[in-house]
Amino acid sequence: MAVGNINELPENILLELFTHVPARQLLLNCRLVCSLWRDLIDLVTLWKRKCLREGFITEDWDQPVADWKIFYFLRSLHRNLLHNPCAEEGFEFWSLDVNGGDEWKVEDLSRDQRKEFPNDQVKKYFVTSYYTCLKSQVVDLKAEGYWEELMDTTRPDIEVKDWFAARPDCGSKYQLCVQLLSSAHAPLGTFQPDPATIQQKSDAKWREVSHTFSNYPPGVRYIWFQHGGVDTHYWAGWYGPRVTNSSITIGPPLP
């Protein structure tokens, strides 16, 4: 039997059609068409289907979700918000705040180092010198797709990670500071662990530092990330801590 009006289709068919429509178009356009479409687009079922279809959850997903629509958007936006975290583009996107000694430098991970590093996609790192070297990056959340209401109402977890290592032949000191900033760049949350001092003749293994911001105040619009360090023997060259594979992610990770 021919259907003259799309609204005459069974609701389950309409829901299936909506799973193929981009999420922003559903909310900004389709939801305004009529009350039927609005009610269908607001159904939990639709957003669970979209999550499943796009691989954001698995068939056997059993974890509680407070709001499937928000969950979908957080999953779709989930990625590393720091650009050029592994020095593949030199110092592009980074601000060299303090460039002491022989200044910041990019080096390649050796074949042995690649075997030891937990991510085989990482091939380069940034290295510091005999006077303090610090570099930073500011993440503009709105520019990255995280609108103000989402950040203020949902306040999703913000996870920060960084990797650092010393040289086996020289001691070094590594430092990290991450701040959640308001629209006026006032700090609303800070993670600044004590500097990590690594002694000479250490194992030179790569170490991960991580922190999750939760239940922070509303108003977060930017994230400021700064790291670096210095060697503790003041040797000419690049004997300070090495850093790479830094990341800032928001919301639940992909399965």
Swiss-Prot record:
InterPro entries: F-box-assoc_dom, F-box-like_dom_sf, F-box_dom, F-box_only, Galactose-bd-like_sf
GO BP terms: ERAD pathway; glycoprotein catabolic process; proteasomal protein catabolic process; SCF-dependent proteasomal ubiquitin-dependent protein catabolic process
Gene Ontology CC terms: cytoplasm; cytosol; SCF ubiquitin ligase complex
Segments forming domain FBA: 71-252
Residue ranges of every copy of the F-box domain listed in the record: 3-50
UniProt note on tissues of expression: Abundantly expressed in brain and kidney. Expressed at lower levels in heart, spleen and liver.
Keywords: Ubl conjugation pathway
SUPFAM superfamilies cross-referenced by the UniProt entry: F-box domain (SSF81383), Galactose-binding domain-like (SSF49785)
Presence of the UniProt keyword Transmembrane helix in the record: no
Record PANTHER family: F-BOX ONLY PROTEIN 44 (PTHR12125:SF13), F-BOX ONLY PROTEIN 6-LIKE PROTEIN (PTHR12125)
Function (record text): Substrate-recognition component of the SCF (SKP1-CUL1-F-box protein)-type E3 ubiquitin ligase complex.
Protein name per its UniProtKB record: F-box only protein 44
